[in-house]
UniProtKB/Swiss-Prot annotation:
First and last residue of the signal peptide: 1-23
Cytoplasm recorded as keyword: no
Record keywords: Antimicrobial, Disulfide bond, Fungicide, Plant defense, Secreted, Signal
GO BP field: defense response to fungus; killing of cells of another organism; signal transduction
InterPro entries linked: SCRL (IPR010682)
Protein name: Putative defensin-like protein 237
Listed Pfam families: SCRL (PF06876)
Protein family (similarity comment): Belongs to the DEFL family.
Disulphide bond pairs: 30-94, 40-71, 48-84, 69-86
Superkingdom field: Eukaryota
Cellular localisation: Secreted
Species of provenance: Arabidopsis thaliana (Mouse-ear cress)
């Protein structure tokens, strides 16, 4: 009987450890953003990356951590605006609000 209960107790302990680890999620990295006049290009992600690369002064090391970009068109009054946001794979986490 002792041999039968050992695996059950072991599985229960593993279950507790796995659930404890799930509660400690990785903090999200702060995105890089740009909001200015104009419109997104046809290839929105590529346009956004090139705009951030040319208009903001980030090192190549920071630019290499970018995993994805998105561009959203907006309109304020009679002026076109766009909002670029690029997410990063690594870097400093966003501060808690």
């Amino acid at each position: 009987m002792r041999h039968a209960t050992s695996p059950i107790v072991f599985c229960f302990l593993i279950f507790l450890v796995m659930n404890h680890v799930k509660g400690q999620a990785k903090k999200k990295r702060c995105p890089i953003g740009l909001h200015t006049y104009g419109k997104c290009g046809t290839d929105r992600a590529k346009f956004c990356f090139s705009e951030i690369e040319s208009k903001l002064s980030f090192s190549k090391q920071v630019l290499n951590t970018i995993s994805s970009c998105r561009c959203d068109d907006d309109r304020q009054g009679n002026k076109d605006l766009y909002w670029c946001q690029c997410d990063r794979r690594e870097g400093r986490p966003c501060p808690a609000n």
